[in-house]
Amino acid sequence: LQLDAPLSMSLGQDDAECFVQRIAGNDWRLKNVGVENLTIDSEYDTTNPKDENHAWEGVYINKVKDGWVRMVNFRHLAGSAVVTQRDASRITVEDCISQAPVSEIGGYRRRTFLCMGEQCLFQRCYSEQGMHDFVAGLCAAGPNAFVQCDGYESLGYSGAVGPWCTGLLFDNVNIDGNDIKFCNLGLEGYGIGWNTANSLAYQCTAAGIFADSIPDGSNNHVFACWAQFNGSGDFQQCNNHAKPWSRFASLLEKRLGRDVSSQCRVLERERNNVSNNPTYDVAQKMVEEARKPRITMQMWIADSARFTASVSPG
């Protein structure tokens, strides 16, 4: 028996009856389809800043395998910029920006980049004022990855908004003013309980990062992140940087055995040694660096146009 993806949770006879089932017939999903180079801007009642009588979803992906969404700007949506549904697998969403959402501030709204499929990659995505900027939903099978994603003025946590979304990777995900949660949410959201297991937050920043260990021995891991930390999970190298800069890019390069910089385009920040008394040469270098505008994720995404032609399918 050969599987095309790692299992994101253990399957034991002590837990439940486990079996392998072959799907009858041909794979009926659409394949090798994508959406790119668009602006999706919803009209709304400008006299009502909480208007919801307008477009909710930007790109909705279901019954698709090996698809992509690339270089799409979203504005004024009430729900999600991109949704990958349960029958979506091997989907890449990259270089996308969501701004100025219009809706009530409440549940099931502004789940900006929402993944309910498996083997989905969201990389270099930017979200403003999302309720849940980067999340997996209801039992997303995984593995799924959010890599180099920034949320600005976040109104709620990122992580998983449904129960048991196992095998999540948050790699260089930055949440402004809110949390990343890999934990037991109890009765929150109609009783989510354990929202994920066997997940990793790597080199992320957030107001708080919550990670719990699961009673069955499954762990959630937090490595080289910057935040306030809470929970019984595995926390290592807290408030420190680590190498490699991107865990995802490092593993992909190792698996393929070749350079993947054109695919991953990692925005690697320079690490300066902290010192109250730097040498003259180091101080001069720091002064020169301070004169340059900091490259934001929006700028990095905007710069993607010159890379796309060489890696775009077809």
Language-model features, listed with the residues they occupy:
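Extracellular beta-strand/beta-solenoid scaffold signature
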Residues: D14-G25, P49-Y60, H76-S80, I105-L114, ...
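Short helix/loop capping segments that flank catalytic or ligand/cofactor-binding pockets
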Residues: L11-G12, E43-N48, V69-R70, A81, ...
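Right-handed parallel beta-helix
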Residues: K31-S42, K65-H76, A88-S103, M116-H132, ...
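Short acidic, gly/pro-rich beta-turn/loop elements at beta-sheet edges
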Residues: L11-Q13, D45, S103, I180, ...
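Solvent-exposed loop/turn segments connecting transmembrane beta-strands
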Residues: V83-Q85
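Small/polar beta-strand repeat architecture
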Residues: L1-T47
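Catalytic domains of carbohydrate-active enzymes that cleave complex glycans
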Residues: V147-Y152, T166-S312
